[in-house]
Amino acid sequence: SDKIFYDSLLDNLSEQFEQFELDELFIVNKIIIDISSLSLKNNRLDNLEKAIEMSQKIMAKIQDWNRMPILKLIEWKYFLIKQKDIIKAEQSFMKACLFAQMTADQYLENKLIQEWEKDVKSY
């Protein structure tokens, strides 16, 4: 099943984290974010927290903050859906907007705000 595939892929990436070169970590991070997005879309949140932590670890190592707004969006959805914690979700939302501001991406920031408002209404 997809769940078994995603879980084993995530486990393998996690186990091999230290062996990847810096340029490979950019690709690994994209894969993790894509898996996280699919997990959210399919409401399969079991390993989402682990994926978020791994992606944050990679971003810190490679100093690539461009994907951080998207990761924080995934994180706030996780906090709302799985943990039912609007306070943590709002903190992630604020961080997502902050990272969008740091990259001077006004369009992304506006999209994040729209998505947040939609998510809070359905919470």
What is each residue range found by the language model?
Residues 10-19, 52-60, 94-105:
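Amphipathic alpha-helical segments of tetratricopeptide repeats
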Residues 42, 82-83, 103:
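Structural motif corresponding to the intra-repeat A-B loop/turn of tetratricopeptide repeats
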Residues 39, 72, 79-80, 120:
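Residue at a conserved register position within TPR or TPR-like alpha-solenoid repeats
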Residues 72-75, 92:
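TPR/Sel1-like alpha-solenoid repeat signature
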Residues 1-4, 17-34, 60-73, 101-113:
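Alpha-solenoid helical repeat architecture
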